[in-house]
């Protein structure tokens, strides 16, 4: 499907002017006539390029503070006119064919993201003429090329050179897809913003703007196809958000290893998000989306050694995340000790990568150093619907804890309690975590009764010969009965951290007092399903 179309006239009107001067220079040097509007036209003229203002071409001035620029038959007729079919009427009305449209849209997303953005500010950044030209050109892609991404500029010039001043239908069709994706995402952002304003805008309502729009529009970009999904009979792909600002598995760079699988990505996300909770050098080992070993240490090697000791059996074939650069010593320890699917860290030294290269199947990802955690939304698909909630970024500090028992925790118990509370947030409910000296010693995950999670954590610790006596225990939600406390006490736990809030809190606290256990209430729950 070659069907080449020569590019003789291009209309350029962009908000993001990155690369536009160089692109316009390349087009002009190849004999392409340039039409432009407003700030883009002024910029090109300042650079000495021969450019015709759209208002001069149409004979109709820009008006209403730039609200009306390109909404004119001589513009849209030139874009929508079908070559070989509409030529007579175009000639009759002095409409010149426009072969390429280069447009990106007003920065609506950036505007509404600014603190203190008013509805009036948002409205003035809703592009009208831009999307209209984009859709017109994309509709008529058989004859017209539409360019909405500056990243395409170089490839377009190369193809024009390779095809004697023309672009192929395949290229124009691909550009049209990008254009429709661009306008769909743009309109979705506007719809989401206006939808969230409904409570504050209707009638005499004094309600604040809603957190969730009445219609939720989502746009994700496909990053990769996968061999299969969670199971081999399921097809799958990985989609990511555009302009993600926080270091994540979605933004990470894979520096070695096989392509990531569906399960690799899910588990790596769980490991990375958990290790982000710690300021000290930390290591998190994950299996089936649950931490099976977590520790902080004097170095990441120390942290890895301690995390691995929690559950070496489960660590086999796991995902390992660090919050510091992967160094050669740690890489060697991992490769020598265990089979690992993925290692992710902010960065990796050259020496470390030489060591991991010996195991070509090991996937190594670098994600960059992270800063402040970015608020966002979490989604859970149910049959016929979507559950949406704020991302769980909640965490408590020592000053927010309430001691509810007769005995106060020791300094080490308190440190361990805060440590295992951070881990429990990332363990599937019902979640119980035993910790001692800033390392997990037993993790009970995903049980239907909390007492069995507590028992499993104790069994795990015993199996690995880890001393539970003097340890702290975290529970992601309250204890409905005292049995979980009794099980923990039998194992040797001396401090418990939990949300509180059960109708039997008094009974649970009394059990802790009976066993001489210090108990801390967080008043915050961390269910994870």
Swiss-Prot record:
UniProt KW keywords: Acetylation, Hydrolase, Multifunctional enzyme, Purine biosynthesis, Transferase
GO BP of this protein: 'de novo' IMP biosynthetic process
Domain MGS-like: 1-148
Domain of life: Bacteria
Residue stretches spanning the membrane: none
Pathway: Purine metabolism; IMP biosynthesis via de novo pathway; 5-formamido-1-(5-phospho-D-ribosyl)imidazole-4-carboxamide from 5-amino-1-(5-phospho-D-ribosyl)imidazole-4-carboxamide (10-formyl THF route): step 1/1; Purine metabolism; IMP biosynthesis via de novo pathway; IMP from 5-formamido-1-(5-phospho-D-ribosyl)imidazole-4-carboxamide: step 1/1
Gene Ontology cellular component annotations, sorted alphabetically: cytosol
EC number: 2.1.2.3, 3.5.4.10
Catalytic activity: (6R)-10-formyltetrahydrofolate + 5-amino-1-(5-phospho-beta-D-ribosyl)imidazole-4-carboxamide = 5-formamido-1-(5-phospho-D-ribosyl)imidazole-4-carboxamide + (6S)-5,6,7,8-tetrahydrofolate; IMP + H2O = 5-formamido-1-(5-phospho-D-ribosyl)imidazole-4-carboxamide
UniProt modified residues of type N6-acetyllysine: 287
Gene Ontology MF terms in the entry: IMP cyclohydrolase activity; phosphoribosylaminoimidazolecarboxamide formyltransferase activity
Domain characteristics, as noted in the entry: The IMP cyclohydrolase activity resides in the N-terminal region.
HAMAP family: PurH
PANTHER family on file: BIFUNCTIONAL PURINE BIOSYNTHESIS PROTEIN ATIC, BIFUNCTIONAL PURINE BIOSYNTHESIS PROTEIN PURH
NCBIfam families in alphabetical order: PRK00881.1, purH
Similarity section: Belongs to the PurH family.
Protein name: Bifunctional purine biosynthesis protein PurH
């Amino acid at each position: 499907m070659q069907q080449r179309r020569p590019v003789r006239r291009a209309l350029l009107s962009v908000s993001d002017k990155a690369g536009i001067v160089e692109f316009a220079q390349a087009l002009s040097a190849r004999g392409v006539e340039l039409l432009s509007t407003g700030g883009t036209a002024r910029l090109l003229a300042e650079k000495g390029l021969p450019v015709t203002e759209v208002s001069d071409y149409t004979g109709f001035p820009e008006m209403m503070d730039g609200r009306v620029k390109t909404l004119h038959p001589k513009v849209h007729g030139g874009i929508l006119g079908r070559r070989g079919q509409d030529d007579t009427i175009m000639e009759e009305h002095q409409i010149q064919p426009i072969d390429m449209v280069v447009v990106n849209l007003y920065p609506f997303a950036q505007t509404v993201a600014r603190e203190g953005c008013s509805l009036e500010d948002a409205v003035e950044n809703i592009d009208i003429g831009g999307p209209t030209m984009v859709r017109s050109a994309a509709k008529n892609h058989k004859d017209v090329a539409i360019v909405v991404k500056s990243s395409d500029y170089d490839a377009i010039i190369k193809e024009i050179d390779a095809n004697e001043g023309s672009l192929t239908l395949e290229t124009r069709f691909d550009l049209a897809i990008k254009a429709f994706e661009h306008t769909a995402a743009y309109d979705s952002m506007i719809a989401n913003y206006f939808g969230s304003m409904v409570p504050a805008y209707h009638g005499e309502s004094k309600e604040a703007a809603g957190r969730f729009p009445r219609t939720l529009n989502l746009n994700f970009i496909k990053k990769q196809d996968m061999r299969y999904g969670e199971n081999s009979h399921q097809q799958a792909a990985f989609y990511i958000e555009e302009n993600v600002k926080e270091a994540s598995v979605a933004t990470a760079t894979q520096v070695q290893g096989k392509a990531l699988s569906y399960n690799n990505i899910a588990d790596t996300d769980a490991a990375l998000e958990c290790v982000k909770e710690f300021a000290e050098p930390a290591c998190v080992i994950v299996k089936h989306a649950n931490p099976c070993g977590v520790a902080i240490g004097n170095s990441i090697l120390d942290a890895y050694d301690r995390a691995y000791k929690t559950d070496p059996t489960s660590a086999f074939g796991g995902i390992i995340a660090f919050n510091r650069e992967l160094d050669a010593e740690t890489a060697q320890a991992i490769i020598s000790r265990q089979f690992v699917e993925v290692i992710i860290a902010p960065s990796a030294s050259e020496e470390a990568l030489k060591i991991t290269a010996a195991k070509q199947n090991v996937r190594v990802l670098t994600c960059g150093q992270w800063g402040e955690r970015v608020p966002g939304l979490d989604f859970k698909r149910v049959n016929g619907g979507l559950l949406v909630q704020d991302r769980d970024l909640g965490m408590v500090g020592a000053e927010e804890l309430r001691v509810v028992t007769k005995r106060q925790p020791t300094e080490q118990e308190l440190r361990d309690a805060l440590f295992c509370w951070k881990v429990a947030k990332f363990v599937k409910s019902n979640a119980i975590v035993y910790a001692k000296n800033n390392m997990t010693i037993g993790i009970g995950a995903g049980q239907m009764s909390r007492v069995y999670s507590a028992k499993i954590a104790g069994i795990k610790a015993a199996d690995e010969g880890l001393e539970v006596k003097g340890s702290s225990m975290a529970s992601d939600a309250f204890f409905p009965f005292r049995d979980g406390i009794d099980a923990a006490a039998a194992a040797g736990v001396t401090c418990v951290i939990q949300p509180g809030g059960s109708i039997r809190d008094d009974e649970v606290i009394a059990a802790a007092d009976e066993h001489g256990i210090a108990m801390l209430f967080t008043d915050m729950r961390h269910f994870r399903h």
